[in-house]
Amino acid sequence: MCLRFWPVALLLAFPLAAVGADAVVAQPTTVLRGGRLFDATDTTLTENPGLVVRAGKVVDRGPMDLDTTGARVVQLDDEHVILPGFVDLHAHYAVDFFDAGRAEETDGYPLLYLASGATTTFTAGEMQPDTMRRLRRAIDRGDRIGPRLLTSGPYFGKARPGWDTTRTPASIRREVDQWTARGVEHFKAKRMQADLLRALIDQAHRHDATVTGHLGSGYGQSVNPRTAIDMGIDRIEHFLGGAQLPDTASAYESLPTATPDKAAFDRITRHFREHNVHFDATITAYGYYGTRESDLYADWANAQQYLTPYLRSVLSESDYQAPISRFQRIFELKLDRIKAFYEAGAGDLITLGTDHPSWGEYLAPFGVHRELQAFVRAGIPEAAALRIATINGARAVGMSDRIGTVEVGKWADLVVVRGNPLADIRNTRNVEWVMTRGRLHRAEALRDAAQGTVGPEGAAEADAFKPEASR
């Protein structure tokens, strides 16, 4: 699909040097003074002692008699709070505006994810992996602005359009080799049978890559998360699994009516802990399909302003998703289960994932704030929710030595919000500055640049958003 390139210099707080994610080149020094700091190394909020950023990293922290000649000094006020950048491990860029299949949205979404404070996003299964690879490389070169993009490549399993049901473990291994050679370090399985999943996990690990899975109850040819954990999977999406998901029906059919089984829940929680497997809860993804009665789903971002005028016109005559009682029940159960998982000592294994392939009513990049609010609504403390969104995600993808906390020597991926999120988690919505790769962006400028960019500009472009129509 067509990429509409935005002039990078217009969106930056200071000039950009074209540079990949890991490269170190000469950059201006930035000093952040004032405000308060939640560094995610623990659960406390402190006065910001002063942060010095150079060459994309935090190089000093603390009271300084620093010669700031030539540096950009940003003076924050008492209402500002500095946080580590958010890590969204189920960040779909795919949209389905025309009920004709999902297509990757690569114009406005990178700006909006970053403007929301998500400095690292994992795509969790791609419909157009070549498109997402081009976007990742453009961001890494500095030609585009967006989060650190952890691309997954295509879905592995029947969720992939055109999936060959005669696939063998050997063919899976060959494809893993191909995608890792193209820069994929994290894979996503969905609707994949056991022998193929085992091959995917083993071959990915040979490349030091990770695997996550949208799995099932064990019904039919689906794989229960407990079985996948025994295979060595790194992360699980959506459902904890175990005996609390009976294998007599699909997960979506059995979960809403299953009788709560504390012993089964305790066993699967212990299995996650013993194998250090992370759980991506994706709570709010299910609420989108429910009644959406809570303020979790308020349109505080005025999301429609980011759609192209043409798409707004088309969608104005569409009926959005009607509530589905089964998904409302799943949403409520997930709120209950995530708190129980946290209280069982598995809080360090929870990660944040938004998972919302938008049909236009809501836009996925704003989901990180809804998911944070859902954790708190479930009964998880605000500080723990922030750690879930930062250091937990970094650990889950093997990047905790580089991102996830604000510490000297780590990459300078930071978010500055107005208002204390430990007092009201909804204050994370008030993003004023985002720093990624050590470069400071005004969130308002990113949002302004994204206005009217999401979706086709006219009927001639609409076919690019209708992949199933061309099959």
Question: Where are these predicted regions, by residue range?
Answer:
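Active-site-adjacent beta->alpha loops and helix N-cap segments on the catalytic face
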Residues: 128-134, 191-203, 249-250, 271
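Acidic/histidine-rich helix-loop elements
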Residues: 91-105, 156-168, 245-258, 318-330
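Acidic, glycine-enriched loop/beta-strand segments at the rims
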Residues: 37-50, 62-64, 363, 381-386, ...
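Active-site neighborhoods of metal-dependent hydrolases
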Residues: 178-186, 234, 244-378, 451-457, ...
